[in-house]
Regions:
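Alpha-helical cap/lid subdomain in secreted, periplasmic
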Residues: 53, 75-263
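Residue-level signal for beta-strand positions within conserved beta-sheet cores that form or flank
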Residues: 10, 23, 156
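A generic, residue-level signal for flexible/boundary positions that often mark functional hotspots
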Residues: 6, 28, 232-234
């Protein structure tokens, strides 16, 4: 008991002085309709919650309907308006690439080349295969490469965090915008899992952390019981409502504890 009483004030003190690493920081958000402040599915977005809870100043450049090929434009606009003054960037996009049937593609193009090499013997030109990042704007992985090449060159000293797309069910806006659920392949024959896995792979290719919201936030619109987290049970289980955004925000708040915001 004496030991407990002696240790408890120390523990209490440690809790009192602890500060979330993203507290009071300036964060740019790139993405699509789930992040776009003009989307009416919710009054509050996940970044609004983070603003309230952590005092984050949000700079939001997300636009509804956009795909990975729009990230360079969003990055340019952010840099033009704020320069190097932001602390970090969060990128949450990809569901529209799936819906629009963008081909997955490859991460690299491979070529036969020669390189100078010597190990235990005199150096000499040696035939090797060499990979080059694929910059194909018509493929998903090519678009991610183009985007991250742009963002990491613009912001070499900033934290860049990727978020995987969340699960999606039907979205029925009108007869010309009638999107089916994720248990169907898209026009190019791919399930959404391939698009999610590609974001995870990009983390290793580009040395950026990824938060797997698809798994961690718990939103699963395929079940009627989870319709409560989305805009409309019958017509829109793609866009989270206020309750859904709060759940995303709570997940992010705890996941971001493991990442520095500024270096």
């Amino acid at each position: 008991m004496i030991a407990f009483l002696l240790l408890f004030p120390l523990a209490l003190s440690a809790q009192t002085v602890f500060q979330h690493p993203w507290q009071g920081k300036k964060v740019a958000y790139f993405g699509d309709s789930i992040t776009d402040p003009r989307n009416k599915a919710s009054k509050k977005k996940y970044w609004t919650c983070l603003q309230e809870w952590l005092g984050i100043t949000p700079y939001v450049y997300a636009v509804s309907g956009r795909q990975w090929d729009d990230i360079p434009r969003q990055a340019d606009k952010c840099y033009a308006e704020h320069g190097d003054s932001i602390d970090a960037i969060i990128i949450f996009i990809g569901t529209n690439d799936y819906n629009n049937g963008v081909k997955i593609g490859e991460w690299y193009d491979e070529k036969d080349e020669e390189v100078m090499y010597g190990h235990g013997q005199m150096k000499k030109m040696t035939p090797r295969k060499r990979q080059y990042l694929c910059m194909d704007k018509d493929t998903y992985r090519g678009r991610i490469n183009i985007a991250l090449d742009k963002v990491k060159r613009l912001y070499p000293e900033k934290q860049i965090v990727l978020l995987t797309p969340i699960h999606r069910q039907n979205f029925h806006a009108n007869d010309k915008n009638w999107q089916c659920s994720e248990d169907y392949t898209n026009q190019c024959g791919e399930y959404i899992e391939e698009y999610i896995e590609s974001v995870k792979e990009a983390a290793n290719i580009w040395a950026v952390p990824v938060i797997d919201l698809n798994a961690l936030c718990g939103l699963y619109p395929m079940m009627d019981e989870h319709a409560r987290y989305f805009n409309n049970a019958e017509t829109d289980r793609l866009h989270p409502n206020d309750l859904g955004h709060r759940r995303i925000a709570k997940t992010l708040m705890y996941q971001l504890l493991t990442l520095p915001c500024a270096f």
